[in-house]
Amino acid sequence: MSGIGNKRAAGEPGTSMPPEKKAAVEDSGTTVETIKLGGVSSTEELDIRTLQTKNRKLAEMLDQRQAIEDELREHIEKLERRQATDDASLLIVNRYWSQFDENIRIILKRYDLEQGLGDLLTERKALVVPEPEPDSDSNQERKDDRERGEGQEPAFSFLATLASSSSEEMESQLQERVESSRRAVSQIVTVYDKLQEKVELLSRKLNSGDNLIVEEAVQELNSFLAQENMRLQELTDLLQEKHRTMSQEFSKLQSKVETAESRVSVLESMIDDLQWDIDKIRKREQRLNRHLAEVLERVNSKGYKVYGAGSSLYGGTITINARKFEEMNAELEENKELAQNRLCELEKLRQDFEEVTTQNEKLKVELRSAVEQVVKETPEYRCMQSQFSVLYNESLQLKAHLDEARTLLHGTRGTHQHQVELIERDEVSLHKKLRTEVIQLEDTLAQVRKEYEMLRIEFEQTLAANEQAGPINREMRHLISSLQNHNHQLKGEVLRYKRKLREAQSDLNKTRLRSGSALLQSQSSTEDPKDEPAELKPDSEDLSSQSSASKASQEDANEIKSKRDEEERERERREKEREREREREKEKEREREKQKLKESEKERDSAKDKEKGKHDDGRKKEAEIIKQLKIELKKAQESQKEMKLLLDMYRSAPKEQRDKVQLMAAEKKSKAELEDLRQRLKDLEDKEKKENKKMADEDALRKIRAVEEQIEYLQKKLAMAKQEEEALLSEMDVTGQAFEDMQEQNIRLMQQLREKDDANFKLMSERIKSNQIHKLLKEEKEELADQVLTLKTQVDAQLQVVRKLEEKEHLLQSNIGTGEKELGLRTQALEMNKRKAMEAAQLADDLKAQLELAQKKLHDFQDEIVENSVTKEKDMFNFKRAQEDISRLRRKLETTKKPDNVPKCDEILMEEIKDYKARLTCPCCNMRKKDAVLTKCFHVFCFECVKTRYDTRQRKCPKCNAAFGANDFHRIYIG
């Protein structure tokens, strides 16, 4: 009877009817095979025997049906394999055909310049490979997907249209597709022919000799190539977009395939397990059925009758013990209970396994999604993140410092190169300037020589001309010599007055320092009357000198002629001595200048080396510099006075000697300057060579700066010398003109001497000159006083600057002290922080070690818990088995203890009949018989319950919750 629950194969059609034999048996009801039932004592026994025979016949029919089902299943599997191969081949053909059409379309878009992409797409079929349609409502997920996709437009593929169409429609559609492919190929051929013709035409135009045709061909070719380039660009963009979408779809499909493959493998394993279980149960059922059939045949063939404790069969020798039969029934019930318990346990284990698998999947999903969050929430990750942020900020700072250092390096290199280039340019320009100046000096020397020759010729001519005016000139020279003597006397007096004035000024300064402003006013009031007698004394002396000069001129008129020659000789000798003295003075001045340059260089070097010294040394140096400047100022004043005296002597000398002396002096001066410049040029070239060798050193740079300053100083000095030379030349010209004027004036005077007294005129002129000299001395005195005041103001300003610098130095020293204190505090704090960091690192290491130990203990505890749970489950299993054994043994004990209470065979059969009826009734409504089976799980219910569940969209099995669709249930017929 257990064979009623056998399941149908999945590939069997749902609406199939039972065989004709079965239907005929049900319809007729009388064409039943005759069976011997043996001796029957009551109607109940008759019902029991009829039911037993029906059961045996049903078992035979079920065996036959099962064999038929196996054959049909094999046939269906063959057909499915064949259909799968046919579908695969169709899919391959469709895919390659669609790829062929796609390639043709791309080639047409590539080469067809007249046809657009839209025209091509209208002719083309949708050649997408269809996805295999899922079984309708196979499970809840597919049902939900189908319900979700009901609103979307269906994407009809070529194979889907073929599958849904008849044979004639299929042939027409295939013909249309072949025709479209043929048209596309013919279009490619025509496009290729057009391109070939166009290329041949362009080649003919290019090969033709006409320039206009060649230019037109080139322009046409350029436009064609540009258009082709645009089309290629569009095509590449389209293909790239398509490749991107296809790659995305491929990745999605690949993930789906992987999930489907994993699911298929799981389902296959489940199917194998279930198939093995089904085969096992079927074999057991067949064995029991055969055994039961044999027993029934024996009983029916020989007949039997039960008597109390034992029974004997009429017409045979076999006896059956009723007690043994009851024991067998009890064992059967126990076995059923055990089987039911085992099934319940297996169901529980299966549910537990499903729950564990679902939980495992959920945990996997959560692990995939929540691993990052968990890792981010860990303290180690946060610590690493903080360390990373700190290191990243430090790396950014170091990168910024590196960039700044690189920029500074590049800037310093650029500035260094720029400075070197500027120095080289300056050197080249200075060399050029020196060369040009040397050339100019040589030119001027040549010009001076020429002028000297011209002047010498003129001098000879003037000598020849002046021999006639000799006596007049001698008289004039005698007068000029007397006037010069008188001027010397006046100058001596002036010098004496100046000395007195300096002494008075020094006394005045002392008294000013002692007494103050009141005494200054008294001194200024006392100086005014002193100046007046100083002015009156020369007037009286001038008058006395005039009177004495007039007397001497009258008395010595005869002696003048005899002494003129001697005076001329003495003058020439004096002039030579003066020229020698001038040359010596010039040489001394040059030596002084060189010494000054050396001293200035030494002072610069010492200033550079002692920049970090104290301010007291600076004050001393400033005082020494001021003293040197005062000494130089005195020397300059003395040289100025000497130059004035020389000018007076030049003016007093005759024109011929003066011109000669001037020319000789100019020639010597120019020669000396030329030699000096050449010597300087050689020195500069030597220095340049040395400095070029030592260009990289800082000493070389310092020397270059010193040489540049020296060059600037020499240039300034040379410019000053040129200016002085030009001024002297201008003064010489002025004095020459004045001398000529004096000659004319002397001629007039000689004419007037006859009419007037020459002595008065000379005395008056000398008095005017002395007054002018006195005025000049006053002006010089005022200028010196102004210079002294300016020097004082400069000294005061420098003292204020020194004070400010000292204050700044004190402030900087205090700032340095505070900075050092702060630095010490910060270093202490840094050391404390380092110690704290070390302690924190040690604590972290200790905590890590403790954490590892705790994790190890936790793992050990978990392993122990798992082992304990496993042992507990084993103990529970053993306990259940022991309880079952105890219950079984108790039942045996009860049966052995109470043999009288054993029920009769009729009651047992009635109970079995009730059990079978209960099994044949639907478990959902408990009213109707089972006449429908679910092909997904092979559970049997009544057709009305299944239909109502399908109509109310509760499409799940009431027992196992397996989803089913419209094609997943059908009727069955149980006789």
Curated annotation (Swiss-Prot):
Residue(s) carrying Phosphoserine: 41, 136, 138, 522, 562
Biological or metabolic pathway of the protein: Protein modification; protein ubiquitination
PANTHER family: E3 UBIQUITIN-PROTEIN LIGASE BRE1A, RING FINGER PROTEIN-RELATED
GO CC annotations on file: HULC complex; nucleolus; nucleoplasm; nucleus; ubiquitin ligase complex
CDD domains: RING-HC_RNF20
Function summary: Component of the RNF20/40 E3 ubiquitin-protein ligase complex that mediates monoubiquitination of 'Lys-120' of histone H2B (H2BK120ub1). H2BK120ub1 gives a specific tag for epigenetic transcriptional activation and is also prerequisite for histone H3 'Lys-4' and 'Lys-79' methylation (H3K4me and H3K79me, respectively). It thereby plays a central role inb histone code and gene regulation. The RNF20/40 complex forms a H2B ubiquitin ligase complex in cooperation with the E2 enzyme UBE2A or UBE2B; reports about the cooperation with UBE2E1/UBCH are contradictory. (Microbial infection) Promotes the human herpesvirus 8 (KSHV) lytic cycle by inducing the expression of lytic viral genes including the latency switch gene RTA/ORF50.
Tissue distribution: Expressed in the normal brain and also in malignant gliomas (at protein level).
Organism: Homo sapiens
Coiled coil: 43-90, 168-375, 429-898
The entry's keywords: Acetylation, Chromatin regulator, Coiled coil, Host-virus interaction, Metal-binding, Nucleus, Phosphoprotein, Transferase, Ubl conjugation pathway, Zinc, Zinc-finger
InterPro entries named in the record: E3_ubiquit_lig_Bre1, Znf_C3HC4_RING-type, Znf_RING, Znf_RING/FYVE/PHD, Znf_RING_CS
Description of how the protein assembles with itself and partners: Component of the RNF20/40 complex (also known as BRE1 complex) probably composed of 2 copies of RNF20/BRE1A and 2 copies of RNF40/BRE1B. Interacts with UBE2E1/UBCH6. Interacts with p53/TP53 and WAC. Interacts with PAF1; the interaction mediates the association of the PAF1 and RNF20/40 complexes which is a prerequsite for recruitment of UBE2A/B. Interacts with isoform 1 and isoform 2 of PA2G4. Interacts with FBXL19.
Biased amino acid composition, Low complexity: 543-552
Name of the protein in question: E3 ubiquitin-protein ligase BRE1A
Pfam families: zf-C3HC4 (PF00097)
Family: Belongs to the BRE1 family.
